[in-house]
């Protein structure tokens, strides 16, 4: 049976792959429309669910330093991940429309940005490398700025475009690097069952 670290490492890589799929299909959807929206929504469901083991393993690492704070940060992130996954799944299943979920998905994505930012801050005294923390902070800021830009001016607003670009690059770095460290066992994850 794989350890939490191995599961989280694989999940981080899956999240990185879905980030690429999501960005490409989002661009295709906004430029061409059609089925690309459904593909983007489906990739978002997988991405959000893949991030849950990542949030859990980071909480385990953070618990060595900041107990209650680590649990609160993980709860914020997992709640946002589940909310966005459910909303996007309902969209894929055509139970709701894009207009019905847009505000809630943007809000959930902004909360996801808060999770990335808080994770970067809370991981300061842990074994998580500074580069991953910086990427997490950049991703968090990117998601928050993108949500703001989208809310005030739509997908073509400069803040939305800049925020998505920063979030895209930063989350790729965060997910791919963290996944590699977890899978190669180059990041210490406490094992309380030893």
Describe the role of every protein-language-model region.
Residues 1-194:
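Hydrophobic, aromatic-enriched alpha-helical segments typical of multi-pass transmembrane helices
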